[in-house]
Every structure is written in C-alpha cells, then in structure tokens.
UniProtKB/Swiss-Prot annotation:
Phylogenetic classification of the source organism: Eukaryota, Fungi, Dikarya, Ascomycota, Saccharomycotina
Protein function: ATP-binding RNA helicase involved in ribosome assembly.
Subcellular location: Nucleus, Nucleolus
Record region (Disordered): 1-20, 79-104, 571-613
Gene: DRS1
Name the record gives this protein: ATP-dependent RNA helicase DRS1
GO biological process, one term: rRNA processing
Amino acid sequence: MPDFILTIDSDEEVDVSDSEQLQDINPDFKFQIDGETTNTLEEFDFQENKVKEVDLDEIIKKKGGLKEESDDEELALDGFGMGASKQEEEEEEEEEEVEVPEVKEVVEPEDSAEAIADFYEESSPQQTHTSFQTLQLSRPVLKGIAELKFTKPTPIQSASIPIALLGKDIVAGAQTGSGKTGAYMIPIIERLLYKPSTSTKVIILTPTRELALQVYEFGKKLSHHVNNLNIGLAVGGLNLRQQEEQLKTRPDIVIATPGRLIDHIRNSPSFSVQDIQVLVIDEADRMLEEGFQDELTEILSLIPKHKRQTLLFSATMNTRIQDLIQLSLQKPVRIMIDPPKSVASKLLQQFVRIRKRDQLKPALLYQLLKGVSSRVVVFVARKETAHRLRIVLGLLGLKVSELHGALTQEQRLQNVKNFKSLEVPVLICTDLAARGLDIPKIELVINYDMPKTFEIYLHRVGRTARAGRDGTSITFVGESSQERAIVKSAIVNGKGVAKTVDWKQAEETNKLLESKESVIDEVLEEEKEAKELLRAEMELTKASNLIKHEQEIHSRPKRTWFKGEVMEQLTKHGKKVNSKKRKANEVRKDEGRSYKKTKTDRMKISNKKKSKK
C-alpha cells in the first residue's frame, strides 16, 4: 500500500477494468455475522509503517454531532447542515466531463454449439448430493464443514466437488452467496491430505484484497482439524516483510491478488511456484478482462502447465472460449447454476417517487433512518455522496459507516466489522465497494441512487430477505424511462408497493439542512487540513528513516516490478486518470487523434516541417 492519505477526489467510483456490467463481477465475498470472522486477520499488520487516520467522528462531535440523545427530533431541530450547494455539485460534475469520441459497440459473436462441444468435456448426468457424507470426504474435512455450520451441499458444491476431486479442469458459474468458495476449497483440502507438505501446491487468485482475506479466513476454518496444512496470504495492503517470512515456510495453499503474487515470485527468493498442481481463479470473468490481462498472462507463464488442474469460478461465467484458450485448459467441465430472475418471496419492495425533488433526498433518508437499530445498507452511485451523507447524518446524531474506494484497506475492514457487530447499524456504500458483500440479517436495503440495471437491483435487494427471513427494500425513483423500467421489472417479479412519505416534514428538515450548509463545509475543510498535516508528518518520518537507515536500505537487493499496459493507462504524469479520460485515451490510441488540435499542437507540426526543410 502506498504511503499516502486517500482522498475523495472524484465523484464516480472507478473500477480498474472499467466494466459497464457490474452484475458480472460479484466476488464470493461473505462476512459471516454468526462467527468471529476477523480474528485470524489480527495476525497480519496492514502496513509496515502504520498510517495514521483522520478521526472524522471526532471532528463531527466537535461540531455538535453524534450526541447520545434519546430524542431524535430535538437533534433535527438543532439544525445541522447539508454539504455543498447544488451549484457546487454541478461544477464538480462538469469537471469530470471529458469529450470522448463516439465508439461503436462491438457485439461479440456467441460460441457455436460445435465450438462448445469441441472445447468442453461432454457433460454426463451427475448425482445430486443432499449430504456431505455422500461426497466421501475425510473425517477432518467433515469436522471443519460441521464447525462452519454447513448442513448440506449447495447446488454448485454438489456439482463441482466430485469433479474437482477427480483432478479435472472446471469452468463454473453461480451467483453470489451460492457457496463457490466451498466448491473449490473443500476438494483442494481433501486432496492435500494425501500429499507430502514440502512445497506450495495450490495458488488461489482473487481480484480484490477483501475477497482474498475472506477466502483465507474460510480456508483456515475449514482446515482447522487437518494436521500440517498451512495457508499463506499474499495481497497488497498487508505487511510485505511479514508475508515474505510466511512464504518462506512454503505453505500448501497461497491465496493472492495478481500484483502481489508476481512481486513475491520475482523478489522472494525462497518462494517458488514450480510445484503448483492446482490453480484457482476466483471471479474468473473479471480476471480475464483487460484490467488483469497482463498480470494473468505473466502468472500463467511462470506456473508450469504440465499436470496442472485449473478451476475457474465466477458469479456469471459467460466468458467466450477464445478468452479461455490462453489458460491452457484440458477439456474442462462446464458447470452453470442459473441465478434467480426474481426477488426473494419474503421481500417487501417499497418505492418512493422523487419526481423533481432530488434536493429532499438527504432529508428523506434521515427520516427513514431515525430510530433504526437493525442493520441497514444504503446504496449510492458515487463515493463523494457516501462520504458527504456520512457527515450529514453524523451531524444529525446518527451513527453511520461508509464503504467505498477512497478508504484504506484497514478502514474498509473496520467499517464492515463495526457494521456486523451493530456498533454502527447503517452502512452507506457504492456498488463497486460492496461487490459480493453478503452480510446475513440485514433487514433493510435503501437504494438512495437508482441502479443502472435490473440485475444490479437484484444484487442489491438480495442482501436482505435471505434464508427465509423477512426483508424490506426502499428505492428512490426518478423520472427517467430507465428507472421506470427497472421498477416495472421489480414489480412483475415480486411484490411492490408505493411508500407513503411525509413530504411536508421532509421539506422542513431540508430547510434546516440548507440553513446550516456552512457546518458541513467546516467539517470537510477541517478533515482536509488534518489529512494534509498527517501527510506532512509521514513525509518527515519517511525522510528521517531514509537518512537513519540509509546504509541498510542501499544494501537490500533491488526489487523488480511488473507494470502492464493498463497501469500505464491508469497513470499520467503521476496522477490517476478517471474512467472517461481513460476511454478517450484508448480510442485515440486506436484511431489516432480525433479532437481539435491546440495552438501547441500546430506549433509542433510547424516546427517539424521547418526542420525537414
């Protein structure tokens, strides 16, 4: 993790792969409420030198927020304010706009029946297992399964485990929360029971640190009764030296993100992948996208192909055969578990028609959250919105956490932990940050901003009304045809009602918010100053360490780094490029300059012509 303080410098949450289909990238990332899911993570340091964080709650308290008051109405009447004015928000949006040349969408042809038959192994009827005992697993593995409170295999586990135990390659797709992690981890641990523990045998690749941490946690619990089986973790954001020491022990299984794995292969002398027998790619759809293409190619070139079993798992495995060929799969078995096309039967969908009252949304959200003690997830479109709402609601006395890409790794995990323990009952998050987030016992989901597609809507509201429990979703609906179409699909596929709202009360609350806009600006400014002070302290400490330990630093072997094409595109003059600018750069690279030449451009061309003469 770099030594700098993360800031919220752009409205949109940007994904490295820049995928427009968010429903296709949902990591099997579960935080189990009923278990102690963060205990094993305490063995890791999040950084070699701890980065201090700004205590935003303390700033909010100084401004009069987060008071332990019994009467929420008194807090509301105290009149704490909303954030930037509408004009300022529009100016921020304009800064994000970049003229992008129009690109025609290329529709990839679907794989033919002949190509599918030639590439995949011919499917044969499989036994449906209703018990883990019928899978003929060993006693230590069954004990681990029992401690995880698994009673019977899920459809993806029933279909995948027997095939994986045979050593065959697998291409599998199943929705988030279907048990994909168990589908590959159970057969891996079962197979390792009978192999000597002399070197690393299994690599599990995940696209995100959170998913890697969750898989690591799951594997540790599942293998609790297995003797002499070690699991290692190699992800960014955790102590590099500590990971190197762990990899020196040659753990049987290494769970890693692509970049950090390449780093260790290149720079950790005691770590080798020459004996790898199983390669698992979790969220394979996303890993095969352009954002991870270079890293994946590098890893595949380093891991021996012979006698390697490859297991691909994803929420929606719709990758074309042409993209799978590079993985050197040997007649893989294709397993697809269809996701539901409707909401849970016990979910009550409520819709609030906003019309042209967008300015009342913060006040309306406050009304809905007053007095809430159960877990509530609020979805927003932008990380800036999540941060601002956290401050506003905090000033009004509500305990709220945020989850988005501008937070550090430690902040994200701590916020989720606080949410799980009900220390903070409300979590405001973006779709990208909450990919695959599966926390049981969520009673209410609020769509503050409407999702882009019905599939994303299903993923959002699917976080409540799980395991036969009742649940409620409340969605703020605008006037666009796209939003109306999503509501229509939701009602057709489940029960939905219009929610009655006291608009008069919302307007009164909004007036109080508008009258105190300066308060939120003061909080944001104080937070910014505190971050700048921390950054200066860190730079001073870094410079001091460079002088103090100069000899030791120069004596270390130089590390080599891998930087693919996408990382080159992501940075320009040391600054992050947002998604719109990146798209424009990609088009210009492919098609040449398609924008108007500037005065500087014309002068360069003129000088070139003169030099030729």
